[in-house]
Design a protein with these regions (language model features):
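Structural motif
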Residues: 9, 70-72, 150
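Short, ordered beta-strand-loop transition motifs
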Residues: 8-9, 84-94, 128-132, 159-164, ...
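Glycine- and acidic residue-enriched flexible segments with recurrent GG/GxG motifs
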Residues: 9, 26, 141-142
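Generic recognition of long tandem-repeat/solenoid scaffolds
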Residues: 14, 99-100, 136-138, 165-171, ...
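Extended beta-strand solenoid/passenger and fiber regions
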Residues: 120-184
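Collagenous Gly-X-Y triple-helix signature in extracellular proteins
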Residues: 17-122, 184-360
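Short, intrinsically disordered N-terminal pre-domain segments
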Residues: 1-14
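Glycine-centered loop/turn motifs
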Residues: 4-6, 41-45, 59-68, 145, ...
């Protein structure tokens, strides 16, 4: 059935195909529709935040959008993916919110990881003391150190230079083979351990440098050229961190090909959706740990809005999902350029990402 609905806003009648009948609704530009209302705020982001905080979603619908420019003049069209989709969810109850996912992708492609690896990453390195040496250069380019033990006893009597990857002890450790254990910071969660997470959120950190548990990590720094660094300050001011029940894939004993548990984690100010959030069910991430913490975003229900271009209005391009592929140690799921569900190695270079954020 195909019928029209209408809505009067400040004397202007807006006509659109019903959002509930045939699910065909192209969305409207909120800056135009609510121009008179927005005039009372410093910017459109303060307006939408006030609306959300008040729980006032009148006249605002899934697939409506706000267009904005990055600090380097790229256009992004942020579409409403869901209104209160996760309200009351979580270990920390989620309040009123809107999750936005860009209609098209960030204009630059980016790998999920520099190597085909989809596990969490917590680097560890063994060193051998000689009783006189105090400074050791690590093979791992650790962004930070979580703990150090000497002969099984924890110590904090050291400094660490992240730029040279050098740990310097106050006193020379006793002689012994592999008697010093240095454990870096990291995450058991594939998304939080990924290069793409750091790139999206303009962070500095270490990522997998190889495909085995013993492969040294490498340091990357996106603080000046990651996506978050390009967002306007007015938008940054209203974005909140998305928290979710993320799948974990990590074991100290070896590389895993499936998720082995889950946990409540902050996904970042900028994130990408899971396979469930796009398709509504598991396909290549068909694992209970991946499926139990998510629901499908309404914007993707019964349509092909998951087909996205590279850059604003660009040609159809594949894009990453947060879900690691089931049965693989190397792959992450992605949305194919034609809209199909598929997966590929984490170092695949022809995959992009949308700009996704939450305002509450």
């Amino acid at each position: 059935m195909n019928f029209l609905d209408n809505e009067d806003i400040n004397g202007t009648a807006y006509y659109f195909h019903s959002t509930d009948g045939d699910r065909y609704y192209e969305g409207v530009n909120l800056a135009v529709k609510f121009a008179d209302e927005i005039k009372n705020y410093s910017d459109i982001w303060q307006w939408i935040k006030a609306r959300i905080k008040a729980g006032n979603f009148a006249g605002i619908h899934v697939n409506d959008f706000i267009r904005w420019q990055t600090t380097d003049n790229k256009w992004i069209e942020s579409r409403i993916a869901g209104i209160n989709t996760y309200k009351r969810y979580g270990d920390r109850e989620v309040p009123n919110h809107i999750d936005f996912i860009s209609k098209d992708l960030w204009p630059t492609l980016h790998v999920m990881n520099p190597v085909n690896y989809n596990n969490g990453v917590i680097p560890m390195e063994n060193l051998s003391g000689d009783g006189t040496k105090t400074a050791f250069v690590l093979a791992n380019e650790m962004a930070a150190i979580a703990s150090v033990t000497i002969g099984g006893t924890a110590t904090t009597a050291y400094t660490y230079d992240v730029n040279t990857h050098t740990i310097t002890f106050t006193n020379a450790p006793a002689a012994g083979t592999n008697n010093i254990v240095v454990t870096g910071t990291g995450s058991e969660y594939p998304w939080l351990a990924s290069d793409l997470y750091l790139y999206a959120n303009s962070l500095k950190g270490h990522v997998a440098g190889g495909t085995s548990k013993t492969s040294p990590v490498k340091l990357v720094d996106y603080t000046k050229d990651g996506i978050w660094s390009k967002l306007p300050e007015a938008l940054k001011a209203v974005i909140v961190t998305k928290r979710a029940l993320l799948p974990q894939r990590y074991s100290a004993s070896g590389v895993l090909s499936n998720n082995n548990t889950w946990g409540w984690q902050d996904m970042g100010k900028l994130w990408i959706p899971s396979e469930i959030e796009v398709y509504g069910h598991g396909v290549w991430a068909d694992n209970a740990w991946d499926k139990g913490g998510f629901v499908q975003y309404p914007v993707f229900n019964c349509n092909m809005r998951r087909v996205k271009g590279l850059g604003d209005g660009g040609g159809r391009t594949t894009w990453w999902l947060v879900s690691a592929g089931a049965g693989y140690t190397s792959n992450f799921c992605y949305v194919g350029s034609a809209g199909l569900a598929t997966n590929s190695g984490a170092s695949t270079t022809w995959v992009g990402l949308p700009v996704c954020f939450r305002i509450s």
